[in-house]
Design a protein with these regions (language model features):
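Acidic, glycine-rich active-site loops and adjacent beta-strand->loop/helix elements
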Residues: 83-88, 110-111, 135-144, 187-189, ...
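Active-site-proximal alpha-helical scaffold in enzymes
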Residues: 106-134, 172, 277-298
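Internal helix-turn-beta structural module
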Residues: 282-283, 289-320
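Short glycine/threonine-rich loop-to-helix capping motif typified by GTGT followed
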Residues: 93-96, 234-249, 314-321
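Condensing-enzyme catalytic core mediating Claisen C-C bond formation in acyl metabolism
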Residues: 1-50, 149-214, 218-221, 252-271, ...
Length: 333
């Protein structure tokens, strides 16, 4: 691997995304991408007594499904990078505690899936034959931790987003047919002073812009190089902000840009306000939809930029601003 510019790594032997899996909740199952997910749940509990246990089960079963589909024995997977939104990443650690694979828990808020793929790609090129990457989120457990108990029935402002209930997992390998992770661009923390916890899109968009521009400068590429430029969960408001900010900086991304939070729900038929969010948003949309687009040869080059708001309930209550982060990976056939 070699360093390009300030924040980008180019892989000499690009790691392969061998196989993926995705499981989503009932609201996502009623969205426009439902047919692309491996499994759609009928309710948020999935036979468990708590939402937290349900989320742990979701990531556990998603990981097992990805391993099974890949044809790689779990004994041959050398590292697992996984994370979620709950305190101490309990969904990942509890869900994967019986996996018997070296576990590296990570937290990047909603950027966690691409953060995991980035770290997994580095270690795959460096020394490992197979690596597992996963992320999850759950609407009910996230609302309980970050906002208000669902029983209160609080009204949600139009700028708020709906945390995706779901998990996505990917098995990376040293060799295979592709798609390949050719570059990663790790993001910097960007804080523009946004304090509204119900407008995460506005808080994260500047970080997405910073990483996007850095990627283009480091690689010498233009937006037109990619068939699709996809952000993780900026939602409708954040997507519009990023498009305008990029245009102001001389980058026209209107023709090939979309956001996972915009794609996963139907704006007219589902009441999700500004769209989807959460670790599971980017993870399920990539693992469910975009991976199949690669396999069907409908796209050949994808820039996936997962965005995260590095905040919690305490800092919001104390009036702190919301730092944003965005990590990007270039995936190509």
């Amino acid at each position: 691997m070699q360093k390009l510019g300030k924040q980008t790594i180019k892989f000499d032997t690009p790691p392969v995304i061998t196989e993926v899996a995705s499981i989503v909740g009932p609201k996502e199952a009623n969205g426009p991408l439902a047919k692309y997910f491996d499994q759609c749940l009928e309710d948020e509990f999935w036979g468990e007594k708590t939402w937290e246990k349900s989320e742990s089960k979701i990531i556990k079963e998603t990981v097992n499904m990805a391993i099974s589909k890949s044809g790689v024995s779990s004994n041959d997977i050398e590292y697992c990078f996984a994370g979620d939104l709950l305190n101490q990443c309990i969904s990942s650690s509890f869900g994967l505690r019986e996996l018997n694979i070296p576990f590296i828990g990570i937290f990047g808020a909603c950027s966690t899936f691409v953060e995991g793929l980035s770290l997994g790609a580095i270690i795959t090129e460096a020394c490992a034959k197979h690596v597992l990457c996963a992320a999850s989120s759950h609407f009910c457990s996230a609302e309980k931790q970050f906002r208000f108990p669902l029983e209160l029935g609080n009204q949600r402002p139009p700028s708020s987003q709906w945390t995706v209930t779901g998990s996505g997992a990917a098995v990376l390998s040293k060799s295979g047919e592709g798609p390949f992770i050719t570059h990663i661009t790790s993001g910097k923390i960007v804080d523009m002073g946004i304090k509204d916890a119900n407008n995460m899109g506005a808080a994260m968009a500047p970080a997405a812009l910073d990483t996007l521009i850095c990627h283009f400068k480091d690689t010498g590429r233009a937006p037109s190089y990619y068939d699709a430029i996809i952000t993780g969960d900026l939602g409708y408001i954040g997507k519009e902000i990023l498009t305008e900010l990029a245009q102001d900086k001389g980058y026209n991304i209107k023709s090939n840009y979309n956001d996972c939070g915009v794609m996963i729900f139907d704006k007219e038929l589902q009441d999700t306000h500004s769209g989807g969010s959460g670790c599971g948003c980017c993870a399920t949309v990539f693992s469910g939809y975009f991976f199949k687009q690669f396999k069907d040869k409908k796209i050949k080059r994808l820039l996936l930029i997962a965005t995260g708001a590095l905040t919690n309930a305490t800092t919001s209550q104390q009036g702190e601003s919301i730092p944003g982060i965005a990590h990007a990976i270039s995936i190509e056939m």
